Amino acid sequence: IMPSLVGSEMCIRDSSMANVLYGLKNTHKITLENIIQHTLSVKMAIKKSLLVVDMPKNSYSNVKKAEKNAKLIIKKTGCDAVKLESNNKNFTIIDRLVKKKISVMGHIGFTPQFKKKFKVEGDTKEKANKLINEALLIEKAGAFAIVLECISPKTAKLITAKLKIPTIGIGSSSFCDGQILVTDDMLGISGFYPKFVKKYINLNRIIEKAVKKYTREVKLNKFPSTNNFLNGTKRK
């Protein structure tokens, strides 16, 4: 929410909240209800940022299901677009959604909903060509933008050069048109920090200090002080 309040152009309500908020090992257990509920809280706070919602795993396993659930997400949350992770099979799904006037963002490279091992993608010529072709097919299907996750710098640069739609990088170098990070990662709240993450502040440490100080003051009867009393009631 905070990035959208200070000038970020886009906010993605991603299924990675499974790891960040619930402490789960992967994103597979996030449900449609989870994503809708969390998106509602974000929608209430943001003003100008484009709001994109990540469709949970298994919510778009076929064209009919994808259309039904995408429409439900948009209706319930008022978001601007949905995001689909690519498995090299859902180009027809993207095409169908776009024809139904639903804005779609693609996602290639490391796709947490379909891949278990966290590694650099597109680091060989053969793998790079597959990713380039995949990106072009997603663009052809009608996606308005595409996330490149954990893709080698050289391949990310090639993809960005070949596409007409914007590429949004996460762990894919500066050779992308835009960048995203998990808010909790950049603020230093989460406990896992991949190499591509830059912590702009260590909120974990700040929060820890604040809670310790609060606990100490309560035990020493320093909080609440008279300044915190209601109606000017003096402490006896």
What residue ranges belong to the model's regions?
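Single conserved hydrophobic/aromatic residue that forms the stacking wall/gate
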Residues: I1-G7, I12
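Conserved anion-binding
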Residues: L50, Y60-S61, I74-A141, C176
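Structural preference for beta-strand elements that scaffold enzyme active sites
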Residues: E9, S41, L50-D54, D80-K83, ...
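Glycine-rich, proline-tolerant flexible connector loops at the mouths of alpha/beta enzymes
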Residues: I12-Q37, M55-Y60, L84-I94, A143-L158
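Active-site/ligand-binding-proximal alpha/beta "capping" segment
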Residues: K68, L72-I74, T124-K164, K212-K213, ...
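C-terminal alpha-helical cap/extension of soluble enzyme domains
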Residues: K154, I165-K236
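Active-site mouth loops of central-metabolism enzymes
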Residues: S8, G23-K29, V53-K65, F114-L131, ...
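N-terminal small/glycine-rich loop or linker at the start of catalytic domains
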Residues: S16-G23, I46-P56, K99-D123, T183-K195
